[in-house]
């Protein structure tokens, strides 16, 4: 259902996903353009109203990502595609250019309004900030009809000055005014009062949607947002799995399911009868779990087991009393059905006799759109897996597809061969062959404290890019001794963190490929920093 303006016609809560912009600011969560496009497509299937695709002026990579998402996802039936821009002409021009292919483009511009930011960061007076905000919103409006304005650090801004800024930018053409709790400082009561104050003291607020953006430094982001909805906010800026810098952002899945499960409580705040069963958001909740796994795999950020809604233990019961109750009637200890978020028992869908068309069809049904090259590689992986595993599940297919969509960087380093030798009375030794970006094949060997350490040492002898391994984790995709193992690693180089992910029934091979994927991201990062030192 398309957003309608003026905003008083907005009779539901709009979901503004900023996974690709604010979420990517998590250390090590950097994504390449193809990965961003994959996530954007899934966000569209999920039903988000607005996708903040990036910060076009920040780097050529961000510009390209926003432009490609605008072209492929920003269709007439797709979501609004948004680009972030500081309150400067060059930022706004870059955003407008990147967003041009989108059917529904939005420019999101911002400037700080708290006295501490004005004094120490901007070194400007309130009058100067007021003029800049009004002028830049009007400038953005000259490119697109849909303009969002954020007064950065609104939670610590003087309310009277905040009201004045918001009134001016709405007069200048802002269709959405976003209230950020930039440092995650406010409590629900304070945040609700802030939104209520804006609703009551900004004379033209009925001409704009009130949006909220918050960080989770005190673990209050979701609670703050729900209080904001009760006081008039109609757009929530959030990320999948709550990823983001520091403690992260408000988690989309928690907000959406809170509004779904407790809709009878929230209905009156949106002018609906309490008994209304109509959803409060446009989200297809059955796509939540799939989207969560996709973002986790591509960013390399694991989901804590006890994470609400999408954690591995979210629907698990250890207590015997709880287990007995759930077996008799799920609602004794579960407030929602796991199937609501797309978490269902996976059926055996394919076997070793299945053909390429059946494989491709099932991947499309699972939401994956692979290129011909990716599909060919994925099918070979599937046939190889089918020879090793008796049962193939959807989780197995997802692991293969995500591995291929993350992709091997054909212009970077490629792992051609890996072999290890180890045992309880042998020193772990690894031999690897790596193809360099110039096409040269190099082979080397190393001894380590274990087989994975030996592989990494051997790869390092070939690649010779200084780095420090700061995280290594293995997760089983399915049950059974023949399960695919997913390996996620994070490397640090100077002040940057890079992640890599791979899946294989052989954990050593998965570990080696995950390491190569991370090294290629590091390699590309070094190239970009050399070409664009300020990016």
Curated annotation (Swiss-Prot):
Domain Pyruvate carboxyltransferase: 13-274
A Pfam family the protein falls into: HCS_D2
Keywords: Amino-acid biosynthesis, Branched-chain amino acid biosynthesis, Cytoplasm, Leucine biosynthesis, Manganese, Metal-binding, Transferase
GO cellular component term, pick one: cytoplasm
InterPro entries: 2-IPM_HCS-like, 2-isopropylmalate_synth_dimer, AIPM/Hcit_synth_CS, Aldolase_TIM, LeuA/HCS_post-cat, LeuA_allosteric_dom_sf, LeuA_bact_synth, PYR_CT
SMART domains the UniProt entry points to: LeuA_dimer
Cofactor requirement: Mn(2+)
Keyword hit for DNA-binding: no
Protein's UniProt keywords contain Phosphoprotein: no
Stretches the record annotates as Regulatory domain: 414-535
Pathway: Amino-acid biosynthesis; L-leucine biosynthesis; L-leucine from 3-methyl-2-oxobutanoate: step 1/4
Catalytic activity reported: 3-methyl-2-oxobutanoate + acetyl-CoA + H2O = (2S)-2-isopropylmalate + CoA + H(+)
Annotated positions binding Mn(2+): 22, 213, 215, 249
GO BP annotation list: L-leucine biosynthetic process
Source organism, top-level taxon: Bacteria
Subcellular location: Cytoplasm
EC number(s) reported in the record: 2.3.3.13
Family assignment from sequence similarity: Belongs to the alpha-IPM synthase/homocitrate synthase family. LeuA type 1 subfamily.
Its biological purpose: Catalyzes the condensation of the acetyl group of acetyl-CoA with 3-methyl-2-oxobutanoate (2-ketoisovalerate) to form 3-carboxy-3-hydroxy-4-methylpentanoate (2-isopropylmalate).
HAMAP family the record matches: LeuA_type1
Subunit-structure text: Homodimer.
Protein name in UniProt: 2-isopropylmalate synthase
